[in-house]
Amino acid sequence: MLPLYEKADALSRKVIGAAIEVHRHKGPGLIESIYERCLLRELELHSIPATTQKIVRVEYKGLVFDEPLRFDLLVDDCLLVELKAVELLHPSSKAQLFSYMKLLDIPIGLLINFHEPLLKNGIFQMVLPGANQKEGSNDSQASL
């Protein structure tokens, strides 16, 4: 197993614990941005570095995409977290997370839906096989 994958896997458990703590205090029914701020605070309290709402710059053969893409949380540069607060997750939510993971070459992602009464029913983990193992160059790339 790759060291970055192992690091992301260990962090995913800590982030899930932090999300459960936020959900225990705030419950379902709030808007996504509130959960994002609370989760970021919970991670700060545990000295887990995370950045929020960064723009993902996408480029393809010299073409830079004008459409801004923003992820919710990047934890310690190896775990991507997308947050939702919706009654029913749309399949596009998982596709969005997977796209960000591919663009940023991140091995593990979490999709967390805080609207669920029991949060464990709203947590999905995704793994990007081969992430962060680039040998050659890609035709497309992304950066923060």
Task: Give the ranges of each region predicted by the language model.
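Solvent-exposed, charged helical/coil patches
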Residues: M1-P49, K120, Q125-L144
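Residues at secondary-structure transition points
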Residues: E6, A10, L30, I34, ...
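Conserved catalytic cores of phosphodiester-cleaving nucleases, focusing on short active-site segments
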Residues: G27, A50, F71-L89, Y100
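Short connector loops at helix/strand junctions that flank enzyme active sites
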Residues: C38, L45, D66-R70, L74-C78, ...
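A short acidic/basic microdomain associated with nuclease active sites
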Residues: E44-K61
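A structural signal for short, well-ordered beta-strand segments
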Residues: K54-V56, F71-L73, I123
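Acidic pyrophosphate-coordinating catalytic loop
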Residues: Y60-D66, K120
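Nucleic-acid nuclease catalytic cores
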Residues: K84-L144
